[in-house]
A protein has these predicted regions:
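Conserved phosphate-chemistry cores used by DNA topoisomerases
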Residues: 1-197
């Protein structure tokens, strides 16, 4: 979280840094919120112990690396919020920060790309021989660069629940026993990306 902490607007943005992967709270009682130091501190930082009326921040943004470990951390954080503070999600306060996957540059211009399509377009626009950097984690992005990703041009994906989505069913599907239904879902929705150096 070093780059985010150094580049944030201290008047409007706060950073809560996790130490490693959070606990999988699926199926646990709310006592874990008080017993687990990370969860207890997060609850206190957001001021949501007694509900959302005193919520300190309108947007709770989950920022992780864009790799498998980062996706797992996102899932664990969403599990925590859905398990114990579902209204935080239902009322539209939880977001995922999009961070660039690539930097494509030539001597005149730098483009940050959030998808393979954007990378290919940038290579085409900045040819003949642009330099391409693949970001593997948030720590590889300097604070000066990061400032542009969390300022006015911030790209966020809001975490939404449809009215017909039952929280217990969602958590059971994604975090419960490894069923054939979930295995088939993963296989059918798996995206394999090339590692571009």
């Amino acid at each position: 979280s070093g780059s985010i902490t150094k580049s944030r607007d201290v008047r409007t943005q706060a950073v809560f840094s996790l130490r490693g992967k959070p606990l999988n709270s699926y199926g646990l009682s709310k006592s874990v919120v008080y017993e687990n130091e990370e969860f207890n501190c997060l609850q206190a930082a957001l001021n949501i112990e007694d509900g959302l009326d005193e919520l300190r921040y309108n947007k709770v943004i989950i920022a992780t690396d864009a790799d498998v470990d980062g996706m797992h951390i996102r899932l664990l954080m969403l599990t925590f919020f859905l398990q114990f503070f579902p209204d935080l999600v239902k009322k539209g306060h939880v977001y995922i920060l999009q961070t660039p996957l690539f930097r494509v540059k030539n001597k005149k211009e730098i483009r940050y790309c959030y998808s393979e399509e954007e990378r290919l377009q940038a290579i085409e626009d900045l040819k003949p021989n642009p330099e391409i950097t693949r970001f593997k984690g948030l720590g590889e992005i300097s604070p000066d660069e990061f400032k542009g990703f969390i300022g006015k041009g911030i790209r966020l994906d809001q975490v939404c629940l449809r009215k017909e989505d039952a929280v217990s069913d969602l958590l059971g599907f994604y975090m419960g026993k490894n069923t054939m239904e979930r295995q088939n879902f993963i296989i059918n929705n798996l995206v394999v990306e090339e590692d571009v150096e």
